[in-house]
């Protein structure tokens, strides 16, 4: 089992954790239906970049 050589300070611990935060999902509004969807993904209606790509 690994054991640290020296104790890390609160400052160093915080600096390491500063990159761990999660970012919110990037949402886009579809041009045809006005629906929110994830970037670079097909909407629930089957539209992608203003064109129907999936027939339901």
Curated annotation (Swiss-Prot):
GO terms for cellular component: large ribosomal subunit. It comes from the Bacteria. GO terms for molecular function: structural constituent of ribosome. Residues 1-34 are annotated as: Disordered. Pfam families: Ribosomal_L32p. PANTHER family: 50S RIBOSOMAL PROTEIN L32, LARGE RIBOSOMAL SUBUNIT PROTEIN BL32. The gene is rpmF. Belongs to the bacterial ribosomal protein bL32 family. This is Large ribosomal subunit protein bL32. InterPro entries: Ribosomal_bL32, Ribosomal_bL32_bact, Ribosomal_zn-bd. Residues 7-16 have a biased composition (Basic residues). Keywords: Ribonucleoprotein, Ribosomal protein. Residues 21-31 have a biased composition (Polar residues). GO terms for biological process: translation.
